[in-house]
Amino acid sequence: MNAPTPLPIGLPDYAELHCISNFTFLTGASHPHELVARAQAFGYRALALTDECSVAGTVRAHMAAKEAGLKLIIGSRFTVRDAQGEPWLRLVLLAQDIDGYGNLCECITQARLAAPKGDYRLLADDLAAPAGELAHLRGMPHCLAILLPDYDPDPRHLLAQAQWCRQVFGDRLSMALELPLRHADDRHRGTVAAVSEQTDVPMVATGDVAMHSRQRKPLHDVLTAIRLSRPIAECGLALAPSAEQAMRTRMQLAFFYQGERGAQVLRRSVELASLCDFSLDEIAYEYPHEVVPEGQTPAGYLLAEVMAGAARRYGKDIPSKVRAQLDEELALIAELRYEPFFLTVYDVVRFARSQSILCQGRGSAANSAVCYCLGITEVNPESGNTLFARFLSRARNEPPDIDVDFEHQRREEVIQYIYKKYGVTRTALAAALITYRTRSALRDVGRALGIDLGVIEQVAKAQAWWDGRHEFAQRAGQQGLDPESPLVQRWAGLIEQLRGFPRHLSQHVGGFVIAQGKLSRLVPIENAAMPERRVIQWDKDDLESLRLLKVDVLALGMLTAIRRTLDMLDALPGRRAHYGAPDKLAMQHLPDEDTATYEMICRAETIGVFQIESRAQQSMLPRLRPRTYYDLVIQVAIVRPGPIQGGMVHPYLQRREAVRNGNPDCVTYPGPEVKAVLERTLGVPIFQEQVMEIAMKAGGFTADEADRLRRDMAAWKRKGNLTQHQARLMKEMVEVRHYDPAFVEALCRQMEGFAEYGFPESHAAGFARLAYVSSFLKCHEPAAFFAALLNSQPMGFYSPSQLVQEARRSRVRVLPADVTASAWDSTLHARPDGAGGQPDIRLGLNRIRGMRPAAGERIVVARAQAPFSSVEDLAHRAALDRHDLSVLAAANALLSLAGHRRQALWQTLALQEPGQDHALLRQARPVEAPLVLPAPSLGEEVVADYGSLGLSLQSHPLSLLRPRLERMRFVTAAALAGYRNGQLARACGIVTVRQRPGTAKGTIFVSIEDETGAVNVVLWPRLIERQRREVLHARLLGVYGKWQCERETRHLVAQHLVDLTPLLGRLASSSRDFH
């Protein structure tokens, strides 16, 4: 029996130079921060993150390594292909310095752009003989190269690979010696060593690390199965044979790499690591220069444009408060040299306005007088209590975040302007990291484990959107599985591990990164799913960590709707003069503080308007009863986790009610220092800025410390960094300044609420303006407003069907889509009877499902030349094929030419396709008597309307069901309005909205709609758990409950639910679910 190999004395130094994270999607089984933490715990000298043709995880690794005090090396792994495109060899490239990092990023970019999204293609010639603009990448200067031999390779193949790599990379080449504890380790070691000696390429120990811990091996297998789209049982040799791709301790490394040769290859890892001296902190970002006219400086040009804007905003006499704020802001901007950043955003906004594209800055930018004068934001900082430190801070030393919303249907014009101005080599969209959530992890893990697909879908459907980690086994048990079985427990455990894992990179909703030089030397660029779109490999959090400029070009549907409304009104006789517009009607021409508008808002008649249309907002409106613009600012912000978790909502409402009733003495302040901060909100903190100001005035925080508090509030859920701030506030405010502990505790809870989702005052102010404008238009111009909403879909909280119902409740007549009258968009038409009031809305051809825009345009053009005389005339002159005609017939849009939809469909079937009209057959057509088909019933018409239009103008579905519902003793929404508080009631309606706010402690709010209106239903958690299927899946919901009404706040508290969906038959309906 052989004696055991003695363990070495002392632990060797080691640097891991071949390590992938879960940013090698569906391959790596650990997060970057987990790998860093394990490398630091094992005492590694350095760690190289070498994800596959990617640096997407490097910023996370960089931040973790800085915190851990571990040296991080930036690198990447590649499969290099031969001239025929076949995989030939694998290697790792490591950046030695900033030039090497730039070369690495360009190499990754070249490979990624040469392949479809999610793939890459790197040819041997791309490294050995790149041409043109990439000639400087020949041999990848300033990068170390490590050849990765296959396991137990053919010596001849490895020799050829090593000789080629030696020729390309010279002395910067090493050869990896990886020992995965498999059957041929000794032979593998010998082959690699022999080729190393033959080619004079030194060996280096590397680990081929794919996980930080051996416990991740089951997850690694699942990822392999997902990547290969097959169950684990069918993956065979594609699975890693053991857990040896986990990080090894230095004791294990000493055991695997024994003897002098072993010690040498371990030392080589540290020597190579010492040659890499690059950190992401060295990245020097340079702002674009062309925004500054030739001959001017950035500071001088910004000052000139700001003062010109101030003159437009305020006239010749700029208020002293505004002038002082401008001076302060401009001085700080100059000190931090951020002028090009502001000018870049200004340039984009100026382009949009030149094209009559509505836009508006949002967020903390509304704290800035500079942004207001440049026209980036529309909230006058003089009208509120702005906190500039929230927007720009000296201590933060990073560009501020300026988000600009543009019309969602015209944002593409702005995007193309940016591409055209700066070029595709200097600008790209930020990435959005798509990660696994519960349901996607549930499905993918289930398939990997070989669980029946039907069972997977049943469990997935039972899993509600709000369910977390603890509910899975219970839901599986409800579907007939044993929740304690090893399979279900394994399923649940792997779902938990996979949740939050990166799945792939997508494109950010609108965050552009723009550079002065080649962007691809800062960060790799790859193809996005959309044509002509490119994304960088970092997301917005990565960019913020590295202080890189991101210009957010966001899309907002309400801006589209408002602009379309104003355009429609502008075309109506007398409307421009009515609003006092000298030329084109714009938002600024609408009157402020309109009484009728606020009356409508207080009645919660806000379906379709911006921000205050949700169930929670509608419930709050009759209680808060906004009467001024600033009331709307509070309204927008108060239905958020910050004020709710801080317990600030009810105290504010109570004080507001008392003041309204003539009792202002109820407004008290917790201390004299904070009175000025809280006066505008009746002594109750509502906004994030107020928390920051209280910290400064009563907690001893400096402005920069308050800004750190803001950042930690935003990151609390991820990092939990609020404890230190909360402890400091408690100590300073309670112990030193003797504030009421209950007030400070509530303030601390509010900080955590802002981490969930809270509006700063500046953000709420911008959104409140749009809420007011959209409310005014709904109140006074409902026809134009609802037509614009229909033309702006998809957007908003409510479906087109609900918007049409609301338009009718607003006394607007809606006419059906018809080829003899409809344009592509919905349009306004004067009432034919000459009566005054609102014009009619004629639904556009764009509402017809399956209708192609080009066909719709041809119909409109042909009709302008002469009216259509028949379906055949329509088909001929508008060049419509059978598909076009069939969708028009199904939508009843041929009614004027052919009669009801059955008759119309019959006629379209009789027509020949364009180009198939044979003269001989046409002359031989038999003479037939016209076939008259029976008209559909009203119920059939409604079902067909919903199938082709998503709505019906003929009847509400519940009107048809009303006799049956009455026999079941369900009453209408209109009848419920007369019920007394506490009365038992039954209601039935189509589910239109489900909401489960995180602050509602498990309560779900449901809206159901019948032919007379909507009913708001409250579902308590106990009922939800008892009747999950009805809550989640019912489309037609019967509710037994208790009616509650207080002033204008009315809802039905459910006690029992009935799923009546089968009564709808083939009617297509869907709800919009929010959480």
Curated annotation (Swiss-Prot):
GO cellular component, one term: cytoplasm
Keywords: Cytoplasm, DNA damage, DNA repair, DNA replication, DNA-directed DNA polymerase, Nucleotidyltransferase, Plasmid, Transferase
InterPro entries tied to this protein: DNA_pol3_alpha_NTPase_dom, DNA_pol3_finger, DnaE2, DnaE2/DnaE/PolC, DNAPol_HHH, NA-bd_OB_tRNA, PHP_dom, Pol/His_phosphatase_N
SMART domains: POLIIIAc
Cellular compartment(s): Cytoplasm
GO molecular function, one term: DNA-directed DNA polymerase activity
Cysteines engaged in disulfide bonds, as pairs: none
GO biological-process terms attached to the record: DNA repair; DNA replication
Source domain of life: Bacteria
Principal location class: cytoplasm
EC identifiers of the protein: 2.7.7.7
Reactions that this protein is recorded to catalyse: DNA(n) + a 2'-deoxyribonucleoside 5'-triphosphate = DNA(n+1) + diphosphate
Database matches in Gene3D superfamilies: 1.10.150.870, Metal-dependent hydrolases (3.20.20.140)
Described function: DNA polymerase involved in damage-induced mutagenesis and translesion synthesis (TLS). It is not the major replicative DNA polymerase.
PANTHER family tied to this protein: DNA POLYMERASE III SUBUNIT ALPHA, ERROR-PRONE DNA POLYMERASE
Family note: Belongs to the DNA polymerase type-C family. DnaE2 subfamily.
Name of the protein in question: Error-prone DNA polymerase
Species assigned in the record: Ralstonia nicotianae (strain ATCC BAA-1114 / GMI1000) (Ralstonia solanacearum)
Gene: dnaE2
